[in-house]
Amino acid sequence: MILSNVEIHRALDEGRLAINPEPLPRLPDGIFDCPYQTSAVDLRLGNEISYFKEGLPFDINLRQGPFVRLFGPNSVTQVITEEQPFVLRPNRLVLGKTRERVSLPLLANSQSLAARVEGKSSYARCGLLVHFTAPTIHAGFEGTITLELINLGPCNISLYPDAPICQLIFESVAGTPVRNDSQFQG
């Protein structure tokens, strides 16, 4: 079951979910944009963009081991600012992270939550994808959310820190999950 904005607030208050810093305001106040939609919350782009070095002399072999071992020594990380955004050219893939840290704790006596990261429709209409095939944020996750940013449009897209880049949709998890660490968690 997808959580409403009211249930997202309740989960934050009860400790079944943590977002740091917490998106504010919780309700529309007429001054600031409210990051809580009826069934999602907006998250912002952090200040680092990472990408494979250009002109690498190899093909990616998915059987060679964990992605993080391949990506680390073959990538560049660029800090972006309001004065120096990252310009995402058409047909280019980069990795970004959310400004916010998200925690979906595994709970024994309460219903755990999982989430899906989705793009913002206004950005999608410009050709920007924020996840390619990896929308799932599993129960037990803690950290910033990695975004696979792809420009499928015909024009360059400037990426600024703190732009509302994606939205999280939360769902209840039936039963108590057993922790299963991955290359990105654990």
Give, region by region, the residue ranges found by the protein language model.
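DUTPase catalytic domain/fold
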Residues: M1-G186
